[in-house]
Amino acid sequence: MKPLSSPLQQYWQTVVERLPEPLAEESLSAQAKSVLTFSDFVQDSISAHPEWLTELESQPPQADEWQHYVAWLQEALSNVSDEAGLMRELRLFRRRIMVRIAWAQTLALVTEESILQQLSYLAETLIVAARDWLYDACCREWGTPCNAQGEAQPLLILGMGKLGGGELNFSSDIDLIFAWPEHGCTQGGRRELDNAQFFTRMGQRLIKVLDQPTQDGFVYRVDMRLRPFGESGPLVLSFAALEDYYQEQGRDWERYAMVKARIMGDSEGVYANELRAMLRPFVFRRYIDFSVIQSLRNMKGMIAREVRRRGLTDNIKLGAGGIREIEFIVQVFQLIRGGREPSLQSRSLLPTLSAIAELHLLSENDAEQLRVAYLFLRRLENLLQSINDEQTQTLPSDELNRARLAWAMDFADWPQLTGALTAHMTNVRRVFNELIGDDESETQEESLSEQWRELWQDALQEDDTTPVLAHLSEDDRKQVLTLIADFRKELDKRTIGPRGRQVLDHLMPHLLSDVCAREDAAVTLSRITALLVGIVTRTTYLELLSEFPAALKHLISLCAASPMIASQLARYPLLLDELLDPNTLYQPTATDAYRDELRQYLLRVPEDDEEQQLEALRQFKQAQLLRIAAADIAGTLPVMKVSDHLTWLAEAMIDAVVQQAWVQMVARYGKPNHLNEREGRGFAVVGYGKLGGWELGYSSDLDLIFLHDCPMDAMTDGEREIDGRQFYLRLAQRIMHLFSTRTSSGILYEVDARLRPSGAAGMLVTSAEAFADYQKNEAWTWEHQALVRARVVYGDPQLTAHFDAVRREIMTLPREGKTLQTEVREMREKMRAHLGNKHRDRFDIKADEGGITDIEFITQYLVLRYAHEKPKLTRWSDNVRILELLAQNDIMEEQEAMALTRAYTTLRDELHHLALQELPGHVSEDCFTAERELVRASWQKWLVEE
């Protein structure tokens, strides 16, 4: 234990003179001397009750002793027979336990988290014991309050603020709200009271028992002003009245306060669960809610003005960088995102701060600095209050109390303590300003050039001149003014509330300032105003862009780079949330993590709610697509990686859709009984084309076929028994339905299943044996070509191995070179006649001569031609790796393979970027001449010459 500092050793002599006789100096331990020197409250309490010191020395405070509070208090109240006795025992118990807590805190015997827990649970124990004693007494006097069914009605108490959060400070008011479940009357009393009268009278007595000062002090100062309608409202409300108030009249600050609300005592009873469920939608909105930030900023402004008005300097709670700002930071995230992130719904600050860090809403460094600062400030606050059991957060100005705090906080002197305090509060202030801002930063923000505000609010005419647009060409200037005027006209047709108008008037000058700084201002503004038209009636999204300048900047740069992204954001504004975090926006999910991410995402949605499941799948896909496109635009993803990500994303979707369809089918029909003898589901999805070849683009559809290995005689084992093969057919139909159903977030993917045996005329799902037989005996050469780019994208190991074996067998069949060459060439010529050359003086990157399809046909031809001799050629299904294999197996010269690979990736890269620009896949005739010449030469060499 750290020895007392010099000023405190001198003060000890004063303490000794005050001590009563039973507490002789020589009988006191070093610990007792330290605590008695530090705290006048402990000194006075132990002087009045010397036996408490004996108890402290023989049974030192423990971190977990809060678990005994209920039993200890029950024992203390066991002989209480009247209200006066109740008040006396509650006060003595509170004082005795507070001395134990002060002892543990002063000597740092337990962590600060434990101190907060003990203080909070002590208050809860005292409140609940007082309530229960009074409820029994009131029931004896007036009868038991009951509902219409005769069921007894309890008084439920909501602990608010730090009490609710389990973070009560040493000397604190307690904020309470009283409620009872249902209307009715008392039964069994001398005269009947309605429940409102019963609980109001009981509530008044409870406040008196806790709050009224006596010769033993008080238990807690009780503050009831957080209840609906404040001091002018009823003291106790029914659940129905509470619900009506919060739904119809609940204000932002009340929502803020309700985050920490906790039901005191038995929190798992039926009525407690009902009350909790009733309040949750008010506190945690289903959608991300950015109105919170302005509300909290307004509250912070009020507090800052109050601090200035009352001259509250050196206030560690309300001052800049103080405890309140840490609470605001945490609650911003809770109120904005708590409805969608259950981990943010904790009432306690530290667990919520951990969840914020885990969700990457704050950097690890910022979160850790806030955690350390919070614990430092809370310890300092509690030590300060425990000196005199006084509710204060203002640092002392006298030398004695400064010396006390420096010693207890483990600093050599007061300047060292204040230096550390300043560092912590500076860290808090920095994070607070970045997130919420204050009056000063708002003033700077509002000082944005008045000309931009005029440009927006006056909607200047086309022939007006404005200096802020002077740098643009005359055409662009006219176009910008027209776009602004048209946008304002469009707004007049929409129903936008006063809050929406206010946010828009704040947002637009900033947006115009940023957009018009660009050379492509007119084009970018046209895309963004089209997006804004779609969201102006949804203030939440406007607030997002208004409150987060970084999100606005990302929106502008992405819309400038890609009309496809602008269209996606306009169609699905939920995606705007992705703009908040540049770390994830430009960093797509790891290719092997899509399945896990999607699984986690779907856990938020009830498994049995098909509509929400479908919506969640589509929202996940769109968010991931946005990230991939953003990384593509930023140049952090090369073309091959773009396709890899799009393909992995599609596979994760297929996985989830099959899972959903399977669960639904099994619930309806049971499982096919042949699965009892084997692992897996006996089902596979084979991806062809771009999916099979790892070459998906942004708007690619999925070429799929479905396989099963169900015997002819298999049946399902459910109550509604059906033929096993019929089960797999319905499963495939269900999968197609889940992909193609149009929800408010669109469809998932266009799916084309025409590559199955016999095409559109064939069965939607095929047995593995029938597929093998068809490929061996009926398939055309072009179907074998398609098989080159096919692979299982979902399926159990048995079926996957079977398909791979069939594919390998078909591809390694010996083929007559000339015949194969002719068939492949003629098929390509038919395709070209059908698809290519539709745009005069343009080059169709995919379909025209020298384009992507020619390269694909070259690789397919060479695999089918030489796989009989070189089976390794069957290993991969994508063109780039097939070209590598052709070089490695001495079919094609390495230089040619590399040149074709470069041409192929260059052309595909262009297709990706055209898609981002929402442009068709053709370019000027004089583009890519070198690549086309190279491809033509290879075509001639392999598919024309003998």
From Swiss-Prot:
The keyword Transmembrane does not apply. Residues 1-440 are annotated as: Adenylyl removase. It comes from the Bacteria. It catalyses: [glutamine synthetase]-O(4)-(5'-adenylyl)-L-tyrosine + phosphate = [glutamine synthetase]-L-tyrosine + ADP; [glutamine synthetase]-L-tyrosine + ATP = [glutamine synthetase]-O(4)-(5'-adenylyl)-L-tyrosine + diphosphate. Pfam families: GlnD_UR_UTase, GlnE. NCBIfam families: PRK11072.1. This is Bifunctional glutamine synthetase adenylyltransferase/adenylyl-removing enzyme. It comes from Escherichia coli O7:K1 (strain IAI39 / ExPEC).
